[in-house]
Amino acid sequence: MGAVSRDDYIALCTELVEHDRCYYVLNQPTISDYSYDVKMRELQEIEVQHPEWKVSWSPTMYLGDRPSGQFPVVPHSSPMLSIANVYSLQELEEFFSRTEKLLGYSPGYSLELKIDGIAVAIRYEKRLFAQALSRGNGVKGEDITANVSTIRSLPMRLPQEAPEDLEVRGEVFLSYEAFEELNACQREQGKLEFANPRNAAGGTLKLLSSKEAAKRKLDLSVYGLITDQKKRSHFENLQLCSQWGFFVAGMPKQCRSRQEVVERIREIEEMRAALPMAIDGVVIKVDNIAHQDRLGLTSKHYRWAIAYKYAPERAETILEDIVVQVGKTGILTPVAELAPVFLSGSRVSRASLYNQDEIEKKDIRIGDSVYVEKGGEVIPKIVGINLAKRSLESEPWKMPSLCPVCHEPVVKEKVSVRCINPLCSGGMLEKICFFASKSALNIDHLGEKVVTKLFEVGLISSCSDIFALTEEDLKQVPGFKDRSIQNLLASIAGAKKVALDRLLTALSIPFVGSSGAIALADHFVTLDKVIEASLDELMSIEGIGPKVAASIVAFFSKHENREEIRRMQELGVQVLSKQSDKEAPLQGKVFVLTGTLQQMTRTQAEERIRSLGGKVSSSVSKSTYAVIAGSEAGGKLKKAQDLGLSIWNESELLRILDAKSVS
């Protein structure tokens, strides 16, 4: 690691915070586990060398997996920590040596599959399924009982030989077969496909409808047992779990020596491709429970366990073409078109090439036989070339000098190539898709396929055009039926009230992601103040460096960008300013939504409640301030009535939200 400045340190913290959010909250990883671990180790080294730089929000202070706010947070019975990773046999040997030194002798080990899923804790009371929690921050987790209860392999009642009260911990996952079925359904409905089974499992656990979750065929593999009746070994605990009706994947094995562990690691790696679910390694645990207790834990990891991570799965296929896409900020990105190949449980036909420099560095050419890997990335990447199969007639690939969409000259930047034509339809289409996406305004029923169709028929050519759409416009579009038209218009109407940080994210300001948008909203409070902010004001915000500040100033200095915002406001868009505690009339009040809302989506209702300081829970309790009952409200409404809670209809909620007062 070379010399670093405090700005470099802040930038690395900011980057890792965003990766954490994408991985743990959105379940949309942006880098591979290995790359993340390398960056995290670099951050830890910097903080050791410069402790005076350390900020309170550093990713090294947390385990990740922040609560989404959609589910109540509940304390764990005991810490639910992550397991440290190793990527080589040498690192594994260091774990063995460290463990044996602490114990004073060589213990036995148990070894099990490391399923690539979502960790959960499941409690049983009087042998009946009672509650399920996500890992959360390791101390508290979100209550995901409703969605976990849809898992068919999870026993709702335990046999008499099981303890009355116990907790199991396990991994929720989707089999390859269930994952393919789910993505087929997504395609049929015109929705985006999930990148991998883990993303799909994580997204399913965060669904607000357990009925929808039940359709997705989640599965659960148990890897731990907590009970007052402690057994001698972890392996015995897993055997008991299996006897009580839990699924325990992958034939856990007791190993008496280091060599047995290594042999088992190699055996599983050989059979990995034939497994019905995705795994990314194996977990090695000290088998004796008393030994585990002696070894204890750190603030983040168990000392008695380690995860040996396999290299990402790799396949060889033909690079048939390289196509260039124009992104939402005008950056040209080359994408490899591949002969379809099956990899990590899904069919792969495209791979990321990043930029011209990356292509030149690897000397990637059309027609090459290439090696493709799929880690946690949205699309796979090319990691090597089989030069023995390269044609003598192949030629190096060059980035076009003209934009492939608008055919205007492009500009070469330090790393990227950018189309600077503000009217380029390619960049604008990507910008509109992002504007409506879950990561930005989250407009239901306005996915990528719908945006593309509306763009192609000329109904929208800018983000503000979305808010000008009418029923008459949509009736002209082939395939649009009355119900889908009404659903889309209702979603658009609901999106007209938008939190400041959401809008700043949606505008696609170069170098400003969601964390930067939140920082801007927290500091400036109103959109007007952000627009008029000077370079010095922007650079005074922690995490906003010179490059980002200059980009923000440049963005808002352009007439077309200010005009776009003005038009949105003319079409009814209201930017909800960040509320201080004193200005938050719903501060500390807990709401529960049930049934179907007519004038806005549930997500939009939740965001508006939160913008005024309120909280949204998925379950009714005595601490609930009010239950918002839409049409077809179910059991939550009945429970609220039984508890004598306040029950509001949608109109009452809108009145409170619009008045910004509960009086």
Curated annotation (Swiss-Prot):
Entry annotated with the keyword NAD: yes
Binding positions for NAD(+) per the UniProt entry: 33-37, 82-83, 112, 135, 171, 285, 309
Keywords, alphabetical: DNA damage, DNA repair, DNA replication, Ligase, Magnesium, Manganese, Metal-binding, NAD, Zinc
Alphabetical list of CDD domains matching this protein: BRCT_DNA_ligase_like, LIGANc
Gene Ontology MF term list: DNA binding; DNA ligase (NAD+) activity; metal ion binding
GO biological processes: DNA repair; DNA replication
GO CC terms in record: cytosol
Catalysed reaction, written as an equation: NAD(+) + (deoxyribonucleotide)n-3'-hydroxyl + 5'-phospho-(deoxyribonucleotide)m = (deoxyribonucleotide)n+m + AMP + beta-nicotinamide D-nucleotide
EC code(s) of this entry: 6.5.1.2
Lyase recorded as keyword: no
Binding site for Zn(2+): 403, 406, 419, 424
InterPro entries per the UniProt record, alphabetical: BRCT_dom, BRCT_dom_sf, DisA/LigA_HHH, DNA_ligase, DNA_ligase_AS, DNA_ligase_CS, DNAligase_adenylation, DNAligase_N
Sequence similarity: Belongs to the NAD-dependent DNA ligase family. LigA subfamily.
Physiological role: DNA ligase that catalyzes the formation of phosphodiester linkages between 5'-phosphoryl and 3'-hydroxyl groups in double-stranded DNA using NAD as a coenzyme and as the energy source for the reaction. It is essential for DNA replication and repair of damaged DNA.
HAMAP family: DNA_ligase_A
Stated name of the protein: DNA ligase
Species, as recorded: Chlamydia trachomatis serovar A (strain ATCC VR-571B / DSM 19440 / HAR-13)
Name of the coding gene: ligA
